[in-house]
Amino acid sequence: MTMITDSLAVVLQRRDWENPGVTQLNRLAAHPPFASWRNSEEARTDRPSQQLRSLNGEWRFAWFPAPEAVPESWLECDLPDADTVVVPSNWQMHGYDAPIYTNVTYPITVNPPFVPAENPTGCYSLTFNIDESWLQEGQTRIIFDGVNSAFHLWCNGRWVGYGQDSRLPSEFDLSAFLHAGENRLAVMVLRWSDGSYLEDQDMWRMSGIFRDVSLLHKPTTQISDFQVTTRFNDDFSRAVLEAEVQMYGELRDELRVTVSLWQGETQVASGTAPFGGEIIDERGGYADRVTLRLNVENPELWSAEIPNLYRAVVELHTADGTLIEAEACDVGFREVRIENGLLLLNGKPLLIRGVNRHEHHPLHGQVMDEQTMVQDILLMKQNNFNAVRCSHYPNHPLWYTLCDRYGLYVVDEANIETHGMVPMNRLTDDPRWLPAMSERVTRMVQRDRNHPSVIIWSLGNESGHGANHDALYRWIKSVDPSRPVQYEGGGADTTATDIICPMYARVDEDQPFPAVPKWSIKKWLSLPGEMRPLILCEYAHAMGNSLGGFAKYWQAFRQYPRLQGGFVWDWVDQSLIKYDENGNPWSAYGGDFGDTPNDRQFCMNGLVFADRTPHPALTEAKHQQQFFQFRLSGRTIEVTSEYLFRHSDNEFLHWMVALDGKPLASGEVPLDVGPQGKQLIELPELPQPESAGQLWLTVRVVQPNATAWSEAGHISAWQQWRLAENLSVTLPSASHAIPQLTTSGTDFCIELGNKRWQFNRQSGFLSQMWIGDEKQLLTPLRDQFTRAPLDNDIGVSEATRIDPNAWVERWKAAGHYQAEAALLQCTADTLADAVLITTAHAWQHQGKTLFISRKTYRIDGHGEMVINVDVAVASDTPHPARIGLTCQLAQVSERVNWLGLGPQENYPDRLTAACFDRWDLPLSDMYTPYVFPSENGLRCGTRELNYGPHQWRGDFQFNISRYSQQQLMETSHRHLLHAEEGTWLNIDGFHMGIGGDDSWSPSVSAEFQLSAGRYHYQLVWCQK
């Protein structure tokens, strides 16, 4: 044990937090989570242990701008002005200091290992009583599961130890410091340490005791470590559970270890042995270790699909059977290996349906509770995710247990990122930083190695490639050869990774960056001598309105076996709740706390909002990742299961044929499909519809029974096919009414019954409509070629740094947002049964014509206005965001009804999950409340739209809401939006894709750009 004086002054003088060679003082060795049961039955059933006591709750807290400002007296007693805070928590969420959001740039001046003298310091204290029996015998430990960034610990005024690495436990022996009665803990937490240089992850930078604190009482002679490994014969019919147990304390001949394996109430196997390890070398073996091997016939294998778990109980006892203590863990029998270029689980090649997940809560910062963790897992499972990457640090210990039990594959990642270093490997190639890096990797492995859900270790994130990585890769492969290791840094295919694991590599497009080219994922597979599997550690950057082009990745994954999926970036928006002057909550992002530097809204890349409400993009991910695929041939549906281990024992296939959303026929068939099997379903002869319209066949896989992660009736997969269109024609009834045209010096006015249309002859726009005496328009109907920029349109542009290649900057530079209409033509003609208005506009900026729009409006005796639009795009202007029409309707109706793709928001390159049907939603649901306002709410493939008294027909896309594109463009946060008068309607003949391969470079695929030069579309606008 390291002994230093208890004096605060001496601790401050040592400055351990600026010494990369000091990562801990007196911290105990890492190990799996312990509970030290004194009853093996309680260990088997995982009941709360009487030897494990939580210290979570209210602690006294005082904040100081620097550690030197902390008074020495604090070690002995609480300060008179100390506050009370809840532990675990981040002190920034209690109003102390400010959270800082930055992606790459370090929040402190880069001068490793030194940190600013103004180093915010939180002083925590807690008084507690200790059970006298704990003082009489054994060892009492204190466990801090997570403290950011570094801390010193005192107990009863005496210095205990020091720890850093904010994402792994720091555990200390308190036995020598405790006494009967009241005891006092004092914890000095520093915001910045040399460890901060290894924790440059894309997240909020927060501080404090943010994970659980507990006391653990162990016997003097104790189990100090145990690890379990499962091994198999070739066909997985026989397995061996290998348990290596290590003890600490007096090594006596009478000591025995028993390992028993349980499946529920049934004991499957058991073995007992004295200590004394196998021979290691010419000097012998470990006297304090023993390895037991239990044979298991026909084990029920663990997978994310069927997370079968056993329970291993490890007992330390004397020869006469007296139990000293027991530890336990869940065991999943599974094998992970790479063979012939494929990542295999239990002999089957995996397809990773993964997502990156930060630990984030909108109210509690980086504090995770069980309810939130379970909510995340349920949502992931419900949306067809089978894997999660712990980006970019080891998670709360409970997370892994939940993943074991619910079934998720886990990439466990070391808390190492040096993204802001120049070059990135400045520290990771420096031997002085090897001890700090080593602790972060080795302690992660030692804590989490017993979890079957952990199938891959990761050496960290975005830290270049250094010699330290190579050393740690070799250490893991030596200590735990049962799992592959991945690491993206230095080009994603270095010697420190078993898996090619690039981030944001595109399907077909190479990105030849200097030193570390990023090949297309298809090309990577074909590089000479390359036989590793490729799994994208990050792809499909889901920032705001994004995930366009997701389907092309999944087409490639299914086409090329060695493309084994990837992890979407990322799961949850990292917005935080703030309150305005009236106490109303709003969602904040980088810079909203006065934090500098900051990367604004780049913290919001989630498939779900911070409160776990899904983004529309989540449905696209669910659909592309679904485990059932469908093919239609005639009246036969072929259903293929992509499950590797599950039989479809809880699925029905529901099918329906509908004409323009009206059901014509339907049925339900139980699915009986084995793993990777097929089933053919023959549909009956379908009735012939009597009217014209689009005929669609929809199939849905429905789970009739609830599961551990879903309710009864859950839809897990679906597909639609458009059948041959019914071409029967219903002729319109003859009309004897003829619209009347009146011409004045300023307007053309057309009147038919109680309806009137007014076209302004100076502007050439439809300026007003009336139904009776009620005006229908607040603004004229006019062309629209722009959208409120998406995050993907903005890229890395900001006020102080313009990226001229970003779509929004190209549109601005070309004048798309500033373009004004110059009238070229506005004429009116009376036809035999209609009035025809013809207009032409040149949309110009600074004398240059960008678009020419020609329209005809034909108003007939039924009151239908047929609008034909022809648009020519200048050859030297950027491809526009949209080609359509916009106006502000006077009405505000509660409901929106449409026949088209829905129900969720969809865009041309993100619509495979949308279904063609007749949908009816509240107006409020037509708007997607992205925290950073942007273009949103589009519905594609629309044939008919009904709103208030109006109906539009054609083949178009639309969005409709209380917010104009202008307001969305000019507003920084959604809570600042105000509902405008009336309703804004945007009807597009064509709309550009949204992209999403990444959010910092143009990523809309060419086929989803509006590059044709000439466009035509038609609408019918009438009143019901």
UniProtKB/Swiss-Prot annotation:
Its EC number is 3.2.1.23. Keywords: Glycosidase, Hydrolase, Magnesium, Metal-binding, Sodium. Pfam families: Bgal_small_N, Glyco_hydro_2, Glyco_hydro_2_C, Glyco_hydro_2_N, LacZ_4. It comes from the Bacteria. GO terms for molecular function: beta-galactosidase activity; carbohydrate binding; magnesium ion binding. PANTHER family: BETA-GALACTOSIDASE (PTHR46323:SF2). This is Beta-galactosidase. It comes from Escherichia coli (strain UTI89 / UPEC).
